[in-house]
Amino acid sequence: SPQXETKASVGFKAGVKDYKLTYYTPDYKTKDTDILAAFRVTPQPGVPPEEAGAAVAAESSTGTWTTVWTDGLTSLDRYKGRCYHIEPVAGEENHFIAYVAYPLDLFEEGSVTNMFTSIVGNVFGFKALRALRLEDLRIPPAYSKTFQGPPHGIQVERDKLNKYGRPLLGCTIKPKLGLSAKNYGRAVYECLRGGLDFTKDDENVNSQPFMRWRDRFVFCAEAIYKAQAETGEIKGHYLNATAGTCEEMIKRAVFARELGVPIIMHDYLTGGFTANTSLAHYCRDNGLLLHIHRAMHAVIDRQKNHGIHFRVLAKALRMSGGDHIHSGTVVGKLEGERDITLGFVDLLRDDFIAKDRSRGIYFTQDWVSLPGVLPVASGGIHVWHMPALTEIFGDDSVLQFGGGTLGHPWGNAPGAVANRVALEACVQARNEGRDLAREGNEIIREASKWSPELAAACEVWKEIKFEFQAVDTL
């Protein structure tokens, strides 16, 4: 049979063969242990979709461009990737979704790096394809169980911080570059003192001439302890441990642990998955929370027909390890994007996510008991967005207002107060059964009557129109 082409009796036929003879298997039944991938394929003109899909399966598993005699020394049937289904994308000419199944044995256990090297390592430069995008991955429990996952997860984080029943509040310290360590620490203290739970190093604050990392760590730790003492709440500052080498990164993490701070931070795409997984292991062993920033993600995920969708990068992060990850804000975006963002927010938080193509989820994903990751909404949000954010993200999230805190006309601490008051008002209104989508502006206005800080913030940013009226259509 053409399927079992590895028997010696067949003889060795040299030459270039169509990929689809070996790698396109529409009658294949996927196994529970297979890693499944959904690729959006745009073939070059004249290349049939089956051949393109099979080429993806081949190039990302056992195939090479010609038949080689060493194929006879292994069982291709056991190790090859298989393109088992192809469907056209509605409304797009010459776009197809190719589903590929990879046998589990092709991957090293506990290595996101190896998983990506195999699945997306070579195939994106393939000539027969005009463009290729990895839309989704199904990680089988047999594989996800080989990963530690997030250092702590959502529940343990709440227990460590003693904060329940509401989203957490953060703020990125700006200007991101140029402050001295002492002034930086002062800004941190003011925000935490005003009522935020966290402040954050910007992703590109590492260790520059104007502020070396040790100085920053020391001044921020001082700010944290001072704010904790004055407010009676646990506070944190995401100290960015990202560095040029893994050794230096771990050195910074060790110093943070010695200072006794609760949380550090890493840029997982620029730092790389290997570094990130090492850091996540260190964080779990030493009781540090790990905040993940996705700097560079748009380079990879912005094109709709080429690259890797962010939901795949988010799944990979949950396996590699991180307690928070930035995931977009949803507010003021289009409906469709909103559903898709909520799709990967669920992939980060929940144990079991059912297949739902309307939210961009191509496969049912069962994480078994891997801890969840808190999604972080950050970027261009302010107090008027608070009802929408509370409604959309729910309690298990971190809402980060950078300019929305530091841009307050009276300063950082009042800006923090305004955000905290707005958040508490929204949470209370929700718990009393009010509809945040419809009454959001009203709730904020009521709260601003007894909080001058909030009133000032409302005045600066004015009301915004919520672009969603009907939340129930989801």
Swiss-Prot record:
Its EC number is 4.1.1.39. One of its GO terms (cellular component) is chloroplast. It catalyses: 2 (2R)-3-phosphoglycerate + 2 H(+) = D-ribulose 1,5-bisphosphate + CO2 + H2O; D-ribulose 1,5-bisphosphate + O2 = 2-phosphoglycolate + (2R)-3-phosphoglycerate + 2 H(+). Keywords: Calvin cycle, Carbon dioxide fixation, Chloroplast, Disulfide bond, Lyase, Magnesium, Metal-binding, Methylation, Monooxygenase, Oxidoreductase, Photorespiration, Photosynthesis, Plastid. InterPro entries: RuBisCO, RuBisCo_large_chain_AS, RuBisCO_lsu_C, RuBisCO_lsu_C_sf, RuBisCO_lsu_fd_N, RuBisCO_lsu_N_sf, RuBisCO_lsuI. Mg(2+) binds at K200, D202, E203. It is found in: Plastid, Chloroplast. Its main location: plastid. Gene3D superfamilies: Ribulose bisphosphate carboxylase, large subunit, C-terminal domain (3.20.20.110), RuBisCO large subunit, N-terminal domain (3.30.70.150). One of its GO terms (biological process) is reductive pentose-phosphate cycle. The disulfide bond which can form in the large chain dimeric partners within the hexadecamer appears to be associated with oxidative stress and protein turnover. Binds 1 Mg(2+) ion per subunit. Its cofactor is Mg(2+). The record marks K333 as: Transition state stabilizer. The active site is at K174, H293. RuBisCO catalyzes two reactions: the carboxylation of D-ribulose 1,5-bisphosphate, the primary event in carbon dioxide fixation, as well as the oxidative fragmentation of the pentose substrate in the photorespiration process. Both reactions occur simultaneously and in competition at the same active site. HAMAP family: RuBisCO_L_type1 (MF_01338). Belongs to the RuBisCO large chain family. Type I subfamily. Heterohexadecamer of 8 large chains and 8 small chains; disulfide-linked. The disulfide link is formed within the large subunit homodimers. This is Ribulose bisphosphate carboxylase large chain. It comes from Dendrophthora clavata.
